[in-house]
Design a protein with these regions (language model features):
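A short, structure-level motif marking secondary-structure boundaries and short turns
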Residues: 19-22, 51, 82-84, 107-108, ...
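Active-site flanking residues adjacent to catalytic metal/cofactor-binding acidic residues
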Residues: 8-10, 50, 115-117
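Substrate-recognition element of Asp-dependent hydrolases with the DxDx(T/V) motif
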Residues: 32, 36-66, 74-86
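Short, flexible loop segments at the rims of nucleotide/cofactor-binding pockets, characterized by
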Residues: 23-27, 55-57, 88-90
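Non-cysteine beta-strand/loop elements that form the S-adenosyl-L-methionine
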Residues: 5-11, 74-80, 136
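Asp-based, Mg2+/Mn2+-dependent phosphohydrolase catalytic module
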Residues: 60-76, 85-114, 118-177
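Active-site neighborhood of HAD-like aspartate-dependent phosphohydrolases
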Residues: 1-47
Length: 177
């Protein structure tokens, strides 16, 4: 498997609970920085891709999030600051952030992977552009797979991982295998 880039959701995937936590207070899981470094060591671009509607409410800024993602080692961050009620094309499950990344970095999105914890947003956005889909069971992941499965029933994840690090190890095994 030739992977050009990996997109990673924030809340519930790299840390937190799945709920909004301001970047100044957000703590990544103990393995998240290692997972990002493994991708970088294998020359795989790593992008944060997150809905953060609290920006539109003035509770945080794009700069707050960009600094956070840069400190973790992400190559870039694609952040939707809008609420789900706004008529934007970037709020997941719409694929606007992925399309923006594709244009900016000349990516073939069918050669990318999306790692996230929410089936009805992360997995649907990935599916819309033909990206591989990895659902992690942290954050909302377990609930997405069980009680909320009907909201994305027509989509199957390519892999279900216990967490972000396991997802990255699966990607690397497919690249090397």
């Amino acid at each position: 498997m030739n992977i050009e880039a990996v997109f990673v959701d924030r809340d519930g995937t790299i840390g937190g609970t799945g709920h909004f936590i301001h970047p100044n207070e957000f703590a990544p899981y103990s393995f998240s920085r290692d997972a990002i470094q493994i991708l970088k060591d294998h020359n795989i671009r790593t992008f944060a891709c997150t809905n953060q509607h609290r920006i539109s409410r003035g509770e945080a800024t794009l700069d707050d999030f960009n600094k956070e993602f840069q400190s973790y080692g992400f190559d870039d961050a694609f952040i939707c600051p809008h609420s789900s009620d706004d008529a934007c094309n970037c709020h997941k499950p719409k694929p606007g952030m992925l399309l923006e990344a594709s244009k900016k970095y000349n990516l073939d999105l069918t050669k990318t992977v999306f790692i996230g914890d929410v089936g009805s947003t992360d997995m649907l956005a990935a599916h819309a552009v033909g990206a591989k889909k990895i659902l992690v069971l942290t954050g909302w992941g377990y609930g997405s797979l069980k009680q909320y499965r009907e909201s994305w029933a027509e989509i199957e994840p390519d892999y279900v991982a216990e967490n972000f690090l396991e997802a990255v190890k699966w990607i690397i095994s497919k690249c090397e295998g």
